[in-house]
Amino acid sequence: MTDLHPVRRALLSVSDKTGLIELGKSLAERGVELLSTGGTAKALRDAGLTVKDVSEVTGFPEMMDGRVKTLHPMVHGGLLALRDNDAHVAAMTDHGIGEIDLLVVNLYPFEAALKRGAAYDEMIENIDIGGPAMIRAAAKNHAFVNVVVDVEDYGVLLEELDQNDGQTSFAFRQWLAQNAYARTAAYDAAVSNWMAGAIGLDAPRRRAFAGQIAQTLRYGENPHQDAAFYTDGTERVGVATAEQLQGKELSYNNINDTDAAFELVSEFAPEDGPAVAIIKHANPCGVARGATLLEAYNKAFDCDRTSAFGGIVALNMPLDAETAEAITQIFTEVVIAPGASDEAKAIFAAKKNLRLLITEGLPNPQDAGLTTRQVSGGMLVQDKDVGHRAMDDLKVVTEKAPTEEQMADLLFAWKVAKHVKSNAIVYVKDGQTVGVGAGQMSRVDSATIAGVKAQRMADAMELPESLAKGSAVASDAFFPFADGLMEAASNGATCVIQPGGSMRDDEVIKAANDAGLAMVFTGMRHFRH
């Protein structure tokens, strides 16, 4: 095998015709013979290029509505033959098989059909057979054959040919082959996952995942870790599909925290009023509603002014000038919002390092999906936590029932607690978190920390008593003992929302009654690890 190998004959068969004519002309100008199929051949001919149909090469017409056209030894022999193997060369000569040095294929648009919700039969017809077979054949024989599966690589291919006098290097072909195998793997993953859903398999025997590189990151969570950001093709509204209007390149931690912030704030529908979430290390340090976006931001900021420094701000409404001005008064890493006014953009423009992401919408917090986590030797896969509770879903278990105002705060706290690392305790008062206890091994400790935060908030605002007084409390899981509940009561809480389900529920309910608390059960847990 030699390092450099010439490109004299190319087979082009593409669904996406972007850049096809330019590529065909460039190859023809370099003396490359063009083979093609169906609509690709027609497009090239219409552009005035000389093209040989694959059916002329195989001696068989395209048949079965195009299902069979390239699955033939005259094609696969030309892709798979080892040019330095005498037996292979002899077989090619005996059977009149010509070498194919370049394969350009992009596959039937299965993923596009999936996104638009095509019917079952249409999905089946969008499963490419000949394309992946040729891609895998060409990639296997990358010692001699180039395989291009992405439009953005057309220019790279031409540059390689020009740099090597019409030849390509082994390293280049190897790079193309890796990308080709990744493409067919992603394609098959999309097909298998669609089919699992179509037939209702919650836990298929094999599960495939695929991603498309979006960004090579400077480093991971820490500087000694390499990292990259991949999109999964679902196009859920959020950080992966947002447009970055300004600011430094997003880091690994920026992306992780921004996703957490936007998913949280999306729990609050715009029609219910402005809402703002401020996130640090994937935990909320402040979440609030307000009559205006500015009021919501100020209330969220007041929750924990210290932790908000260097945080992520997520809005459920387009950013306006007044809120933009307030945000710029403190160092903020990222702001993510459905939109931004021209005035707000102008204010942010003076802060060159501040990253502004625009999503053009909010995700539906109840949209189904999967979450994954690597463990040693395997992967955990589960349904996304899209559990939702409304007022009618709650069960009052104490002698005292929450008032209408308390119920509103309880539901607010419950939405926030869903996005706090367990064990999670959240104190809320008047549509504003006043204390968040996150990630503690003991639920009592989380309640204590949330109480400390509420007192610090009061001190910072020069208020005479802790903001936990009169607050609503949410716990992401049941209270196994009454101690966590009593800690919240000692801090001044007046009502509680929790899943219930402890073997000591009766003991906890009695403690709530003795303390004069109103308490409701949701029947749903929101662990987050």
From Swiss-Prot:
InterPro entries: AICAR_Tfase_dup_dom_sf, Cytidine_deaminase-like, MGS-like_dom, MGS-like_dom_sf, PurH-like
GO molecular function, one term: IMP cyclohydrolase activity
PROSITE patterns from the UniProt entry: MGS (PS51855)
Gene Ontology biological process terms from the UniProt entry: 'de novo' IMP biosynthetic process
Reactions catalysed according to its record: (6R)-10-formyltetrahydrofolate + 5-amino-1-(5-phospho-beta-D-ribosyl)imidazole-4-carboxamide = 5-formamido-1-(5-phospho-D-ribosyl)imidazole-4-carboxamide + (6S)-5,6,7,8-tetrahydrofolate; IMP + H2O = 5-formamido-1-(5-phospho-D-ribosyl)imidazole-4-carboxamide
Keywords, alphabetical: Hydrolase, Multifunctional enzyme, Purine biosynthesis, Transferase
One Gene Ontology cellular component: cytosol
Ranges for domain MGS-like: 2-149
SUPFAM superfamilies on file: Cytidine deaminase-like, Methylglyoxal synthase-like
EC number(s) from the headed UniProt entry: 2.1.2.3, 3.5.4.10
Metabolic or biological pathway, per its Swiss-Prot or TrEMBL entry: Purine metabolism; IMP biosynthesis via de novo pathway; 5-formamido-1-(5-phospho-D-ribosyl)imidazole-4-carboxamide from 5-amino-1-(5-phospho-D-ribosyl)imidazole-4-carboxamide (10-formyl THF route): step 1/1; Purine metabolism; IMP biosynthesis via de novo pathway; IMP from 5-formamido-1-(5-phospho-D-ribosyl)imidazole-4-carboxamide: step 1/1
Entry's free-text remark on domains: The IMP cyclohydrolase activity resides in the N-terminal region.
Alphabetized NCBIfam families for the sequence: PRK00881.1 (NF002049), purH (TIGR00355)
Family to which the UniProt record says this protein belongs: Belongs to the PurH family.
UniProt name for this protein: Bifunctional purine biosynthesis protein PurH
UniProt organism field: Ruegeria sp. (strain TM1040) (Silicibacter sp.)
Gene this protein is translated from: purH
